[in-house]
Amino acid sequence: MKTYLIALFCGLLFPLGFAPFNIWPFTILSLSLILYLINKTSIKGAFLVGWIYGIGLWGLGISWVYVSIHYHGNLGLVSSFIITFVFISLLSLYTGLTAYLFKKLKTNNEYLDYLIFFPVIWVSIEVLRSYLFTGFPW
């Protein structure tokens, strides 16, 4: 349970590195901590840790979607929340997949894993997220 709460917290830190907050060290801290958690867990557990990380990341990072649906789309409060949560949950599947693939493909060479494999997996999944099913490039 503690691991999942830390993963959620790490996800909440990530968007704080971007506008309007611009506290860029939080992004580095977020990624460092989530990599630590992924290493600590099993391959199956890595997906869940990544998914929960995504819930925090997307929950804070795209909170404007709720505003658009509720206020500009004139949808009810509960319906807007449910739709936004489903959207965030689906986007979090990509961060779960990133964590799973990293854990699955990880070697014993830490330099190769952290400097090459993780960034390549992260960017590849980001490209997939940007185009698959019409994409969401945010």
Language-model features, listed with the residues they occupy:
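Membrane-embedded alpha-helical bundles of multi-pass enzymes
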Residues: M1-W138
